[in-house]
Structures are given as structure tokens and as C-alpha cells.
């Protein structure tokens, strides 16, 4: 049986990446620091996924195990030494924390003389996630390890898309996911092009597809959350049931379309249909997606290369409209949740400093005109 190592045994790891790896005939070693999840994986060796649609079908994922990377790093290194593929779904901010362990696993492959080519795919909501991870891993590699990695270890970027809401069940491994999923991998950085996963798309140039996803799904989802929170909605479905909010989301997506068409020459009709499907996904009555989950970490989401500021910057450069995106940024700066550290910190920054200084600090912008435009909406 083929072997995989997946970092992140959370809902997305189990409910999306785990399903695809299982359907492709892999044994999956889930690596995490959540002892409850790891123990359950080892005790049961399987878990169930429910598809949130009429009929609510279930998929049983088997041939799984768990490794606690904090308690047993040596087991992770051993797993990396023999594995056929490595994936992650841990969040962009956590990638640097697994870099040293990955590097040790790569060094172990080198010492063992394992020259089987291996690809490491960061399945995260970020542009260039796998290459970002590679830059972190390189810090811990010996010169020999670096040469070995360059020859035998690939870090192809990936774009992933599936809504997996926050949830709690008596069975800690059970997870509910939406029917839709999309996983796209760039081929130009693959070290093992012969290993093609079914239900995964492969593209020579990933950038148009990852931007289409991030600027459409992530920007649209976050827009739903921040505007929804402003109007008191508790779930994304509740937000979309408000015609005013839905209209604003559609206006944001129209601006995103203008950018994607101008930049990547996407077909207008196909992109309109893609955005129509996104709205339908947000309106799935079988998904309870809390606004608080989608809106969390606003400081990160207001970053220079993130889902709002990057498309705004690029639209401005192209002299295209971005007024609705600006309004959403204003709502994001105003968002507060006592359970979200970043939203509280954002409020503290705005209380202590001028709005302009906070905008510069959070967004990383130096375009004075754009900074002033954002300030107007806060």
C-alpha cells in the first residue's frame, strides 16, 4: 500500500485531504499535536465523513494512524523517511513550525539512501504555500541535505477549496463537509510526475487558478462574514439570506471578475458561472458555518498579499473599480469578537494610534492615496 504523511489532523485534513488520499489507496499517517485526535485515530484506525447535501451520504476513511509530533518527533521522521507523498493542512502561520521536522525527515531519507522522488504539498489558503514551506525547510538542511532535496524532493504549490465549517461531535473524528471540492497542483515543480492523484487537477501554471480561488472564494467568504457580522448575522447562510448583504457580496465578486479577466484572460461567462456556484455553496442549508469562524484573524486577512488588499492594489494599478472591496475592508477593520485575539488587538491598535497608522501597520501599504481611501471607510 502507498504511504502518505499528512500534517494537520483537523477538520480540513480529515474531511478533505484525507478523503482524497484514501480514495487514491494511501495509508495516511496524520501528524498533529492534538492528543485526543491522535489517540482516536490510533484506537479506531478509521473515521467517517458526512457530505452536507440532500441524503447526507457518508464515506468511511480507513487505513489511518496518528503521530503526536510533540511527543514522538522520531516517529514523524521515520514516517517521512519511507513515505510516498507529504501534504499539509495546518494553516499558513503554522508552516514554519513543521519545517525543522520536515528537514530532519529529508536528512533521514538522504542517510538511508532513499532516492525515491517525493513531493511535499502545502494545501493551505495562501499563494505559493509549498515554496514558502521549502524556504523554511532549507534553513534546517545541511549542505548535503540541500543538494539531496534539490534532486529528489519537490515542493509544488497547490490550491485547495472546500468549505469545512467549525463543528463539534461526540465522535471527535467525525466531520461534515460540503459536496464541492477542488485541489489543483502545479506540474512544473513536481518531482514525481508519475504519481497523479485522481480527483486532483494538475496545471502547468497554478497562479491563475490559485488567484481565482483566493480572490473569489476566500475574498467572497470573508466579505460574507464581515458584512454579515456588521448586520448581526451569526452564520454565513443567515448573512446570504439578507438581500442587502448578498447584493454586496455579488458586487465584490464583480470587481474580482474584472481583475481576473484583465490579468489572466478568464472567460467572462465561465467566471460568472464559477462565482454563481460560490454563492450557492455559501447558501448550502446543510452547512452551519459560523460567521466567527470565517471572520477570525482579521489582521492576517488584511495583509498586503491577502484576499482584500492584493486585489485592491492590482485593480488600482489597472484603473478598475474596487469601491466595494474598500467597503468590505472597512467592515473588517471594525470587526470585533471577544474570542478572537486578532480582532481584539485590532481594536486596541485603533484605540491607541491614528487610523492611518494602523492601516499602514496592518496592510503594509505605502500608497498614500490608497491608504487614505481605506481610512475613509473605517
Swiss-Prot record:
Keywords: NAD, Oxidoreductase. InterPro entries: 6-PGluconate_DH-like_C_sf, 6PGD_dom2, Mannitol_1_phos_5_DH, Mannitol_DH, Mannitol_DH_C, Mannitol_DH_CS, Mannitol_DH_N, NAD(P)-bd_dom_sf. The keyword Nucleotide-binding does not apply. GO terms for cellular component: cytosol. Its EC number is 1.1.1.17. NAD(+) binds at residues 4-15. Gene3D superfamilies: N-(1-d-carboxylethyl)-l-norvaline Dehydrogenase, domain 2 (1.10.1040.10), NAD(P)-binding Rossmann-like Domain (3.40.50.720). It catalyses: D-mannitol 1-phosphate + NAD(+) = beta-D-fructose 6-phosphate + NADH + H(+). One of its GO terms (molecular function) is mannitol-1-phosphate 5-dehydrogenase activity. It is an enzyme of class 1 (oxidoreductase). GO terms for biological process: mannitol catabolic process. Pfam families: Mannitol_dh, Mannitol_dh_C. Transmembrane segments: none annotated. The keyword DNA damage does not apply. NCBIfam families: PRK02318.1-3, PRK02318.2-5. Belongs to the mannitol dehydrogenase family. This is Mannitol-1-phosphate 5-dehydrogenase. It comes from Streptococcus pneumoniae (strain CGSP14). The gene is mtlD.
Amino acid at each position: 500500500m502507498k504511504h502518505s504523511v499528512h500534517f494537520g489532523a483537523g477538520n480540513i485534513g480529515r474531511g478533505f485531504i484525507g478523503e482524497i488520499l484514501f480514495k487514491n489507496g494511501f495509508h495516511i499517517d496524520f501528524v498533529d499535536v492534538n492528543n485526543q485526535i491522535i489517540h482516536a485515530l490510533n484506537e479506531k484506525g478509521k473515521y467517517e465523513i458526512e457530505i452536507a447535501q440532500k441524503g447526507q451520504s457518508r464515506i468511511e476513511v480507513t487505513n489511518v494512524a496518528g503521530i503526536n509530533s510533540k511527543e514522538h518527533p522520531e516517529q514523524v521522521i521515520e514516517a517521512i523517511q519511507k513515505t510516498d507523498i507529504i501534504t499539509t493542512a495546518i494553516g499558513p502561520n503554522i508552516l514554519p513550525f513543521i519545517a525543522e521536522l520536515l528537514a530532519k525527515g529529508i536528512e533521514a531519507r538522504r542517510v538511508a539512501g532513499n532516492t525515491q522522488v517525493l513531493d511535499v504539498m502545502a494545501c493551505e489558503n495562501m499563494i505559493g504555500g509549498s515554496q514558502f514551506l521549502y524556504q523554511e525547510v532549507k534553513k534546517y538542511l545541511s549542505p548535503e541535505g540541500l543538494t539531496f532535496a534539490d534532486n529528489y524532493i519537490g515542493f509544488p504549490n497547490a490550491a485547495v477549496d472546500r468549505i469545512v465549517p467549525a463543528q463539534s461531535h461526540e465522535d471527535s473524528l467525525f466531520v461534515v463537509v460540503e459536496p464541492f471540492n477542488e485541489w489543483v497542483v502545479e506540474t512544473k515543480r513536481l518531482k514525481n510526475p508519475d504519481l497523479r492523484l485522481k480527483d486532483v487537477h494538475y496545471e502547468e501554471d497554478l497562479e491563475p487558478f490559485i488567484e481565482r480561488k483566493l480572490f473569489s472564494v476566500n475574498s467572497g467568504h470573508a466579505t460574507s462574514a464581515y458584512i454579515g457580522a456588521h448586520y448581526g448575522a451569526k452564520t454565513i447562510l443567515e448573512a446570504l439570506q439578507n438581500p442587502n448583504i448578498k447584493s454586496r457580496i455579488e458586487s465584490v465578486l464583480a470587481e474580482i471578475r474584472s481583475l481576473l479577466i484583465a490579468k489572466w484572460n478568464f472567460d467572462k461567462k465561465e467566471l460568472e458561472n464559477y462565482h454563481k456556484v460560490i454563492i450557492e455553496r455559501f447558501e448550502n442549508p446543510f452547512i452551519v458555518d459560523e460567521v466567527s469562524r470565517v471572520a477570525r484573524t482579521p489582521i492576517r486577512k488584511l495583509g498586503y498579499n491577502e484576499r482584500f488588499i492584493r486585489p485592491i492594489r492590482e485593480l488600482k494599478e489597472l484603473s478598475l473599480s474596487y469601491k466595494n472591496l474598500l467597503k468590505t475592508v472597512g467592515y473588517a477593520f471594525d470587526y470585533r469578537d471577544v474570542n478572537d485575539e486578532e480582532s481584539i488587538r485590532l481594536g486596541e491598535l485603533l484605540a491607541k494610534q491614528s487610523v492611518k497608522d494602523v492601516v499602514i501597520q496592518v496592510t503594509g501599504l505605502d500608497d498614500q492615496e490608497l491608504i487614505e481611501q481605506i481610512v475613509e471607510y473605517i
